[in-house]
Amino acid sequence: YYVKKHIEESGTGSEILEGRNILLAEDNDLNAEITEAILERAGIKTERVEDGIQCVNMIEKMPAGTYDMILMDIQMPKMNGYKATQAIRRLPDKDKACIPIIAMTANAFEEDKREAIAAGMNGHIAKPIQLDKLLSMLAEVIRQQENC
């Protein structure tokens, strides 16, 4: 209830988020559970993978357009978020390669943001997640993508 009410009052672009599908790449169960709950209350569907390799594999195997965006943790086992992003950006299917990817990480310094952008990510959100910032970032990235 709080998330829905907050979205309506804040004008963060809830209409643009409703019904979207996001692939969540997060190895920490608690972080994933919190993020999924926030997104679900905002009308966003999520599917979760637990490492960078699973994320790349999921994007490769699913049809382009299955997901509107990826929320990508940086520090994950097997393949970190930067390497997973770079692998996705190199995919031969350009519709899959250009999916918006947002870093979602405890690394909140300016250099971390620059590294995320340099890896090919479209944005950066710091943990712990702040509702306003997350929803605003998602709406902004979706708007930018629709204007491509």
Where are these regions (language model features)?
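C-terminal compact regulatory domains
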Residues: 1-148
